[in-house]
A protein has these predicted regions:
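Positively charged n-region of N-terminal signal peptides that target proteins for export
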Residues: 1-4, 748
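Sec-dependent N-terminal signal peptides
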Residues: 4-13
Length: 750
């Protein structure tokens, strides 16, 4: 399989029979920061991640997969970064098309090879425990995981009548998954029922079956290493006397669980036993626990050798993040020596410099971690901290669209500070190039606001573009442009809540848009509850004034699944006119984008056309901006998310799709099988009259490879000569009146 896919995004705007589909590479717009061209600018940002090695594209080189979680939401997204440079380098490319196919995971997810087949499997959080997905990927189908264990169990009474209970794992933090006893299978270390001791669950796969392909655990030690951890400190020589060997359901259910910890297991001195790096939810540093015992009888005998400045060896920088730092023992530079990545695991910590990379410079079996950078991977992407809210406007009046980003906040000095970040277009109308100008546009950080979401429009009728911004409290602020018509923006006047209202739900996401067509810009405000408030401009063209019409405009509601997201929705609206009427995209807490048709009578309910127009969710708290940025007459999509980064999807694509007016999709009437295929594809068109069909095969960059024409409802296509990989089929189905098109992905295997 190719090392490098070009990302594909399917974006359907369906109304009056028409749907537009966007497909593009992520890097079709160049982004420059401080004179450096970013390698993966549209990689969505990173906040609080679990890091693992995984050969995602089956080229024999271990890549990096991050499971990135954002703020208070327990759902995250996998981000795949493909190792592209030689051994010893840290060059990676973003592979969004591979990121889409992982199982849905909550709280945390890490990869370890439990069955010794060379493919890392997925260990992840489930209710009070650990769930496991087996990796069954192949070069032709690289990201394919099958549920293996719904929850890992252990025998808490080994050697006698079995007493089975789940291995507890907090949803906050990550257990230690490693071969403790050096027998070739994976064991588990995790904080015990007392919350301060570490339990050891031994995997008996080797002992029972002489193979490592099972996960059969026995409870071996209630106090592995004979130490306790509490209040950001380690106490030695603990755990005496031992508790009863047999637990009953009462004291299992009554466990006082640890609030949250990350356990990183490694043999730091090459003596054959496991040492620990511990991260704690109440601490701003990690703790190092040195094992002076053996693999069979662990004894933590020194926690001061490098603590509290771990890994401050040879004057390197200590791991210190504001809240809950966790360490991950992974090979970053491909030299077959594991390095260290540290990231926070809780909201309220570093968010735009939150991936700390320590290179293992040791040439022996010991480790020597040397600090390299605190923004690994993030330095190559647009990264504005917590959340990104895109706005396209001509900031310097040169006729080219620039990019302005709002954010919930940059982590600075133990607090979050909201700012606006400006990328100016130094390219051309047809080929934008965004260059970072400032991360504190108009010095808005001085206002001490949170969750700044900008919208642009001339609300005082003086010929220049003003900014309004919503914030976390539900108020709207006005940044007045005093430059005058045709001049670069000059925002010198900040007006704090000049319109004198606060929305009924917090986190105001405003858009200036003349929804009632009276020539004045109204305020349409998305809110935390998933609704949109309509404030009509009842002032004059030169002196705006806003009156609340409704807090449930169009009856729009983008609340997520309450069992996951509670009562929140985080609506971020984008109204636009496509020539046939007003349409609405709404970003949401779940990351999906809702698409509505707005009736001419705006007092009526809007028509929900599609509750998930982006087939591939880019991350929680999506924020769409849909505008023609490359002057080709077609709208392009900028999509912000809670990770503090952006995705970009261009309209410049050969892929266009139609949908029938009656709601039955053409896609549903076309079958392609078998899929995957190793040689022949069969095409079947059902319940549809047509004169001819033309089928084209494209690779994922949009390059046409093959073409077949037919007038039959069933025909075949020979694809034996194509290399293994992912392809797109485009079917043009014609009759006398119309030509309609449909797209299908197919997987070619060897």
């Amino acid at each position: 399989m190719s090392r490098f896919f070009i990302g594909l995004f399917v974006f359907l705007l369906t109304g009056n029979g028409f749907a537009q589909q966007l497909a593009t590479a992520r890097d079709t717009i160049t982004v420059i920061e401080n004179g450096k061209t970013l390698k993966m600018p549209w990689a969505n940002g990173i906040n609080y991640s679990n890091a693992s090695n995984l050969d995602v594209n089956y080229d024999g080189i271990k890549d990096l997969v991050l499971y990135d979680r954002v703020n208070h939401i327990n759902t995250g997204r996998f981000r795949c970064f493909i190792k592209t440079g030689p051994a010893g380098s840290t060059t990676y490319s973003f592979a969004p098309e591979l990121s889409y196919y992982f199982p849905t995971v909550y709280n945390w997810g890490v990869f370890y090879d439990y069955n010794c087949d060379g493919r890392e499997d997925l260990f992840c959080s489930t209710n009070s425990g650990i769930k496991v997905f087996r990796n069954e990927g192949t070069p032709a189908n690289p990201v394919h995981f099958v549920l293996f264990k719904t929850i890992l169990m252990s025998d808490y009474n080994p050697g006698a009548t079995p007493f089975m209970g789940n291995i507890y794992a907090s949803p906050v933090g990550v257990p230690g998954i490693t071969d403790v006893d050096n027998d070739g299978d994976l064991d588990i270390l995790g904080f015990s029922s007392q919350g301060v001791f570490i339990e050891y669950h031994q995997n008996m796969s080797k002992e029972l079956y002489n193979t490592c392909d099972s996960l059969v655990f026995e409870y071996r030690d209630y106090c592995w290493g004979k130490f306790s951890e509490s209040s950001c400190g380690i106490s030695l020589n603990q755990c005496s006397p031992a508790p009863p060997a047999v637990f009953n359901s009462t004291n299992i259910d009554g466990k006082t669980y640890h609030n949250g910890a990350c356990l990183t297991c490694l043999d730091s001195d090459g003596d054959g036993d496991k040492d620990l790096i511990l991260g704690d939810i109440s601490c701003n540093h990690v703790q190092y626990a040195y094992n002076i015992g053996t693999a069979s009888a662990a004894l933590i005998g020194d926690s001061t050798m490098m603590y509290p400045n771990f890994p401050a060896k040879n004057n390197t920088t200590r791991i210190q993040l504001n809240i809950f730092p966790c360490a991950y023992y992974v090979d970053v530079d491909g030299d077959n020596k594991k390095d260290l990545i540290a990231t926070p695991s809780a909201f309220g910590s570093e968010n735009y410099k939150s991936v700390w990379y320590y290179n293992n410079s040791s040439n022996t079996s010991t480790v020597n971690f040397q600090f390299v950078k605190n923004n690994f991977l993030q330095e190559e992407m647009i990264e504005v901290g917590q959340n990104a809210f895109p706005l396209i406007m001509d900031e310097n009046a040169d006729g080219k669209p620039d990019l302005l980003l709002g954010t919930y906040g940059f982590y600075t000095g133990n607090t979050l500070v909201s700012r606006l970040t400006l990328y100016r277009n130094i390219g051309s109308l047809s080929q934008p190039v965004f260059s970072l100008i400032t991360q504190d546009y108009a010095a808005l950080s001085a206002q001490g606001l949170f969750h700044l979401i900008p919208s642009a429009g001339d609300i005082d009728n003086d010929g220049d573009i003003d900014l309004v911004m919503g914030n976390s409290t539900g108020q709207i602020h006005w940044l007045e442009n005093t430059a005058g018509a045709g001049n670069p923006c000059n925002f010198t006047v900040f007006k704090n809540n000049p319109f004198g209202f606060t929305t009924s739900s917090a986190e105001a996401a405003p858009q200036l848009y003349d929804i009632d067509l009276d020539g004045k810009l109204d305020l349409l405000i998305g809110m935390k509850n998933g609704r949109i408030a309509y404030y009509r401009n009842t002032g004059t063209a030169a002196t705006p004034g806003y009156s609340l019409i409704t807090n449930t405009f169009g009856n729009v509601n983008v609340q997520g699944n309450p069992s996951i997201y509670g009562i929140d929705g985080y609506a971020v609206p984008y109204f636009f006119n496509d020539g046939a009427g007003t349409k609405l995209l709404v970003g949401s807490i779940s990351g999906t984008i809702f698409y509505y048709d707005v009736p001419a009578n705006i007092a009526q309910n809007f028509v929900l056309v599609n509750p998930s127009v982006n087939n591939y969710n880019e991350g929680a708290q999506s924020a769409p901006f849909f505008v023609d940025v490359n002057n080709d007459g077609k709208r392009d999509l900028f999509l912000g998310n809670a990770g503090g980064g952006l995705s970009f999807f261009s309209s410049a694509s050969p892929f266009v799709s139609l949908q029938e007016v009656d709601g039955t999709t053409l896609d549903q009437k076309v079958s392609i099988y078998p899929n995957p295929t190793s040689g022949q594809l069969n095409v079947q068109i059902n319940a549809l009259e047509f004169e001819s069909v033309c089928l084209q095969v494209f690779d994922m960059s949009g390059r046409a490879l093959n073409q077949v024409k037919s007038d039959a409802n069933e025909f075949s296509v020979d694809v034996r000569e194509l290399p293994a990989g992912l392809y797109m089929l485009k079917l043009q189905i014609k009759n006398k009146a119309t030509q309609r098109e449909v797209y299908k992905k197919v997987l070619k295997t060897e």
